[in-house]
UniProtKB/Swiss-Prot annotation:
Amino-acid positions noted as binding Zn(2+) 2 in the UniProt annotation, renumbered to this chain: 92, 95, 98, 106
Gene: gacH
Family according to the record: Belongs to the zinc-containing alcohol dehydrogenase family. DOIA dehydrogenase subfamily.
PANTHER family noted in UniProt: L-THREONINE 3-DEHYDROGENASE
Protein name as it appears in the record: 2-deoxy-scyllo-inosamine dehydrogenase
Lineage summary: Bacteria, Bacillati, Actinomycetota, Actinomycetes, Micromonosporales
């Protein structure tokens, strides 16, 4: 191995820098991947601000990436040179949550891009069992969206979304847009999407939402027939959870996917029994990576509308600023790392 690479490093408190550093060494059972593309998501922006939890600083962020295997452990030599993406969740396999099939809740959790260095670098080290082979020739920028699409599919599965059900998606950022497409892929109808940003509302409508409005312009749905069967809350805004209960029909379901660090919820618990709705939380990809890869590879999910900013590491500062402030139509920032 040997050699050096450049990487984006976060220090918290809105502090970041580009570093020149040795390429990662692979522990036993781990592979090293040459990263081609890595995307910043909302949790990375909280990490940049210094408001995430359970991480270390300094840290190389990045858990949404795709690349090519550079080195692999014994028994996986044939994987070298093949395109892959990978799961960020490394469970201990021995604690209660891991034994119950919930590695995202592992009591000894390792998270690539949070507790160990991630994919915003020329190379990243990943357990070989966390890697997923991609079809040869697959667009690796699109493949960098495997993890967020897996989260969207996990939400759709956990809420038991059924064909012909009526859906609202509150928050049309990256995850919200992928939930919207995933819901439609199941045969559901997305009757409504919301977002603060006009460009994101436009993308939502172009992706199949019957209507997309500013949250302040949400219609007042009073009749059972007007309300939706399922609401996906993908913004993390506490007020949006309250709005979700206004939109869902009695007996419907609300899925909480969005997450804002430190947000205080304004939900009166009495609303839940009075709404006769089920409230479900979703965290992480939930084992949906292979399904996500297949949907991206066959074009059933289109990432092109949300990959708005493909930049190099040299442009990290203005790109992060656009992502945080949602300016210039930015939905997702993706770093092109092929030359790092």
């Amino acid at each position: 191995m040997g050699g050096r690479m450049r990487a984006l490093q976060f220090h918290g408190g809105h502090k970041a820098q580009i570093i020149d550093t040795p390429r990662p060494e692979a522990p036993p059972g781990w592979a090293v991947v040459k990263v081609h593309y890595c995307c910043l998501c909302g949790s990375d922006l909280w990490l940049y601000r210094g408001k995430w939890h359970g991480n270390r600083y300094p840290i190389v962020p990045g858990h949404e990436w795709a690349g090519v295997v550079d080195s692999a452990p014994e028994g996986y030599e044939s994987w070298v040179g093949r395109p892959v993406t990978g799961d960020l969740i490394v469970g201990c396999q021995g604690c209660g949550p891991c034994r119950d099939g919930l590695p995202v809740m592992c009591e000894n959790l390792i998270e690539i891009g949070f507790t160990v260095d991630g994919g915003c670098a020329g190379y990243v080290a990943v357990p070989i069992t966390n890697l997923y082979l991609l079809p040869e020739g697959m667009d690796l920028a699109a493949a960098s969206q495997t993890e967020p699409l897996a989260v969207a599919l996990h939400a759709v599965d956990r809420i038991n979304l059924r064909p012909a059900e009526r859906v609202a998606v509150l928050g049309a950022g990256g995850i919200g847009q992928l939930i919207l497409q995933s819901a439609r892929a199941t045969g559901a109808t997305v009757t409504l999407a919301t977002d603060l940003v006009a460009e994101r509302r436009k993308i939502a409508e172009e992706s199949g939402a019957a209507a997309a409005v500013h949250p302040s312009e949400l219609p007042e749905l009073t009749s059972y027939a007007d309300k939706v069967d399922v609401v996906f809350e993908a913004s993390g805004d506490p007020e949006s959870v309250v709005r979700a209960l206004d939109l869902v029909r009695p007996g419907g379901r609300v899925c909480l996917v969005g997450y804002q660090v430190g947000a205080e919820h304004a939900l009166e618990t009495a609303r839940l029994p009075l709404s006769y709705a089920s409230l479900v939380g979703v965290m992480g990809p939930g084992g949906k990576y292979r399904e996500a890869v297949d949907l991206l590879a066959n074009g059933a999910i289109d990432t092109q509308p949300i990959l708005t900013d493909i930049v190099t590491l040299d442009d990290y500062a203005p790109a992060i600023d656009r992502a945080i402030n949602r300016t210039d139509g930015t939905v997702r920032v993706v770093f092109d790392l092929r030359n790092e």
